[in-house]
From Swiss-Prot:
Chain positions covered by the region annotation Disordered: 140-174, 189-221, 257-328, 355-475
Assembly and oligomerization: Binds, as a tetramer, through its N-terminal region, with the bZIP domain of CREB1. 'Arg-314' in the bZIP domain of CREB1 is essential for this interaction. Interaction, via its C-terminal, with TAF4, enhances recruitment of TAF4 to CREB1. Interacts with 14-3-3 proteins, including YWHAE/14-3-3 epsilon. Interacts with calmodulin-dependent catalytic subunit PPP3CA/calcineurin A.
Protein name: CREB-regulated transcription coactivator 1
Gene Ontology molecular-function annotations: cAMP response element binding protein binding
Inducers of expression: Expressed in a circadian manner in the suprachiasmatic nucleus (SCN) of the brain. Expression is highest during the day and reaches a nadir during the early subjective night.
InterPro entries: TORC, TORC_C, TORC_M, TORC_N
Residue ranges of the motif Nuclear export signal: 242-258
Key word Hydrolase present: no
Biased composition (Polar residues): 151-174, 292-301, 310-328, 413-428, 443-475
Sections of the chain in a coiled coil: none
Pfam families membership: TORC_C, TORC_M, TORC_N
Species the sequence originates in: Mus musculus
Bias kind Low complexity: ranges: 271-284, 385-394
Length: 630
């Protein structure tokens, strides 16, 4: 059956093809018949017109323009030499009677001879529209194309006046020409762009040449205007003659390019966010989370209007008083830890915490913007990191999320932004906050950011190298405006802290060649355990040190690491921090390092954190960290 069906199918196809060809040829012959009928009438009219207008045109054109009589004779000869073009003249002459014929001819003429066509159709066919007075006025604009080729002054005149004349056109030929241009310009006039340019002085009418400078200045803005006749026929050939090198970008609204590319693999759910890029903050519900770093020229003064703390509601803010001030800066991490209470922190969070980039040279702190409306999770993300600051200190947007009455857990994500500066790695991990469904406070600090290293000591944590630890000690007491911090933080504790941090750095550098747990991430565990688990005062003592307040209501803080680490690290970290989970301190002793007696994380502990296969021995351990029992 297949062999018998194939010949039938082919024969049917051939029959259909022949039928279509026959129909097309019949239509074409009919059109040509009409053209041949109108051609004779046109020739008679043309001869009479040239006899009438010949003497006056010599005075009309003058100077360097060609002889009028030669123009008339050449135009008449042109009708005999190029029958298709002359038939084009013919149909344009008799458009009122043969509108359909004219339309069909123009489509065939454009498709068949796109370069010769404008010579006649545009010379005469366009004039049929532009001069509504009568056929007597058709021929002088026919020679404006000649004027254009021979005289520059005539070029300017012809570009100005015929466009005005064509603004009066009410005929149907302009609509036909526009329709044909929209159909055929992409194919035909692209291929012959150069020849069209050479022929444009002779072939294109004055309107096209008049609009050519406009289209060259602003390429392709009006490629397909709806009802504007002048721009449509004029700008389409001009934009295609550009060769596509200057595309029309006016209608394409590109978003501003992100300096740090978004991670295509990050899941939208915040608890599982692999925060290896700042784009994950968009999923974490941080309205203030930005899309990357500022340009080097951007200063903190430029950003306070954009950066606003993410706040759930004023009731939640006042009831919950849990502030997160993730201020991350390479050189002086502790300088940003200004301890305030909830409402004052809320208003100063956009910048009071985040404008100090380096301990040597902190930039001026701009006035923070007023806090956003109660639910401001839809606000546009602010820029995360300012690269152009001299000390390489990225400015972080404030992420102040105050706990609601149901104590929704906070998930602080620190997606590592890619470093933008060639000399340093300033791409500090911005911290986004999200209220997830888990009741426990899960502070996600990214573990994949090599950008957390200071330019001065690339392998040590910011501000904790031996050279910069004195700065860390001095700025720690100076920035903490709270009297408790100034009284309790002694030089001995600060030095011990810096030594412990250096010890962490040495341990970390031994195993973090893959930058899975860079020095910044280990300090997230250690300092949060040593310094930050104070239950009464908010404020981040360190960008790596995740010190959060519970105001007596949040004794349990779980540090989890997303980044490149598996999600099971939250359980492992909870097991490692189980010893300090229930510690909650009053404002009487703010830095209870001696009371905590926390040993620094050993290599075994860090390997345990690195182990993705490790699970909690007791699954009930997770329940001890939950907040619903409060």
């Amino acid at each position: 059956m297949a062999t018998s069906n194939n010949p039938r199918k082919f024969s049917e196809k051939i029959a259909l093809h022949n039928q279509k060809q026959a129909e097309e040829t019949a239509a074409f012959e009919e059109v040509m018949k009409d053209l041949s009928l109108t051609r004779a009438a046109r020739l008679q009219l043309q001869k009479s017109q040239y006899l009438q207008l010949g003497p006056s045109r010599g005075q009309y054109y003058g100077g360097s323009l060609p002889n009028v009589n030669q123009i008339g004779s050449s135009s008449v000869d042109l009708a005999f030499q190029t029958p298709f073009q002359s038939s084009g003249l013919d149909t344009s002459r008799t458009t009122r009677h043969h509108g359909l014929v004219d339309r069909v001819y123009r489509e065939r003429g454009r498709l068949g001879s796109p370069h010769r066509r404008p010579l006649s159709v545009d010379k005469h066919g366009r004039q049929a529209d532009s001069c509504p007075y009568g056929t007597v006025y058709l021929s002088p604009p026919a020679d404006t194309s000649w004027r254009r080729t021979n005289s520059d002054s005539a070029l300017h005149q012809s570009t100005m006046t015929p466009s005005q004349a064509e603004s009066f056109t009410g005929g149907s030929q302009d609509a036909h020409q526009k329709r044909v241009l929209l159909l055929t310009v992409p194919g035909m006039e692209d291929t012959g762009a150069e020849t069209d340019k050479t022929l444009s002085k002779q072939s294109w009418d004055s309107k096209k040449a008049g609009s050519r400078p406009k289209s060259c200045e602003v390429p392709g803005i009006n490629i397909f205007p709806s009802a504007d006749q002048e721009n449509t026929t004029a700008l389409i050939p001009a934009t295609h003659n550009t060769g596509g090198s200057l595309p029309d970008l006016t209608n394409i609204h590109f978003p501003s390019p992100l300096p740090t590319p978004l991670d295509p693999e990050e899941p939208p759910f915040p608890a599982l966010t692999s925060s290896s890029s700042t784009g994950s903050l968009a999923h974490l519900g941080v309205g203030g989370a930005g899309q990357g770093m500022n340009t080097p020229s951007s200063s903190p003064q430029h950003r306070p209007a954009v950066v606003s703390p993410l706040s759930l509601s004023t009731e939640a803010r006042r009831q919950q008083a849990q502030q997160v001030s993730p201020t991350l800066s390479p050189l002086s991490p502790i300088t940003q830890a200004v301890a305030m209470d909830a409402l004052s922190l809320e208003q100063q969070l956009p910048y009071a915490f985040f404008t100090q980039t380096g301990s040597q040279q902190p930039p001026p702190q701009p006035q923070p913007p007023p806090p956003p409306p109660p639910v401001s999770q839809q606000q546009p993300p602010p820029p995360q990191v300012s690269v152009g600051l001299p000390q390489g200190g990225p400015l972080l947007p404030s992420a102040s999320l105050t706990r609601g009455p149901q104590l929704p857990p906070l998930s602080v994500t620190v997606p590592s932004t890619l470093p933008q500066s060639p000399t340093e790695n300033p791409g500090q991990s911005p911290m986004g906050i999200d209220a997830t469904s888990a009741p426990a406070l899960q502070y996600r600090t990214s573990a994949g950011s090599p950008a957390t290293q200071s330019p001065t000591s690339p392998v040590s944590n910011q501000g904790f190298s031996p050279g910069s630890s004195p700065q860390h000690t001095s700025t720690l007491g100076s920035v903490f405006g709270d009297a408790y911090y100034e009284q309790q933080m002694t030089a001995r504790q600060a030095n011990a802290l810096s030594r412990q941090l250096e010890q962490f750095n040495m341990m970390e550098n031994a195993i973090s060649s893959s930058s899975l747990y860079n020095p910044g991430s280990t300090l997230n565990y250690s300092q949060a355990a040593m310094m930050g688990l104070s239950g009464s005062h908010g404020g981040l003592q360190d960008p790596q040190q995740l010190g959060y307040t519970g105001h007596g209501g949040i004794p349990n803080i779980i540090l989890t690491v997303t980044g490149e680490s598996p999600p099971s690290l939250s359980k492992e970290l909870s097991s490692t921090l189980a010893g300090v989970s229930d510690v909650s301190f009053d404002s009487d002793h703010q830095f209870p390092l001696d009371e905590l007696k926390i040993d620094p994380l050993t290599l075994d502990g860090l390997h345990m954190l690195n182990d993705p296969d490790m699970v909690l021995a007791d699954p009930a351990t997770e329940d001890t960290f939950r907040m619903d029992r409060l």
